[in-house]
Amino acid sequence: MKKVKEAEKRNIKRKKRIRDRIGFGVADRPRVTVFKSNKYFYVQVIDDVAGHTLASVSTIEKDLKLNKNIDDIRKLGEVLAKKLKDKNINKLIFDRNGYKYHGLIASFATSLREAGIDV
């Protein structure tokens, strides 16, 4: 149990260190944050100053019918890019939320860049 608590503390410390480094999202350049569960992948675009979520997508949405694999995560990035372009948001701050920039996280960020969003 002690090892689990220490791992949780390390994860929280890593998240805080990353958030301190990237700064806050504002209306003209909001923060996009990702969360991976064992089954699903969630993404939110957040304006930290106003405290509002501007857009969100996830693999749990029934109309998308996506799984948690690299190809579907790329599609998820394209869907989010379309939502952001409809709201005239072209620049984002990418918050990887403590995860390594590899695999699903990297493919999601790449799909946003390919869709024309400056990350």
Curated annotation (Swiss-Prot):
Signal peptide from the UniProt entry: none
Keyword rRNA-binding: yes
Pfam families assigned to the protein according to its UniProt record, in alphabetical order: Ribosomal_L18p (PF00861)
Domain of life: Bacteria
One of the GO biological process terms: translation
Single GO molecular function: structural constituent of ribosome
Entry keywords, A to Z: Ribonucleoprotein, Ribosomal protein, RNA-binding, rRNA-binding
GO cellular component terms listed in the entry, alphabetical order: cytosolic large ribosomal subunit
Function: This is one of the proteins that bind and probably mediate the attachment of the 5S RNA into the large ribosomal subunit, where it forms part of the central protuberance.
Oligomer and partners: Part of the 50S ribosomal subunit; part of the 5S rRNA/L5/L18/L25 subcomplex. Contacts the 5S and 23S rRNAs.
Family label: Belongs to the universal ribosomal protein uL18 family.
Protein name in the entry: Large ribosomal subunit protein uL18
Organism of provenance: Borrelia turicatae (strain 91E135)
Gene behind this protein: rplR
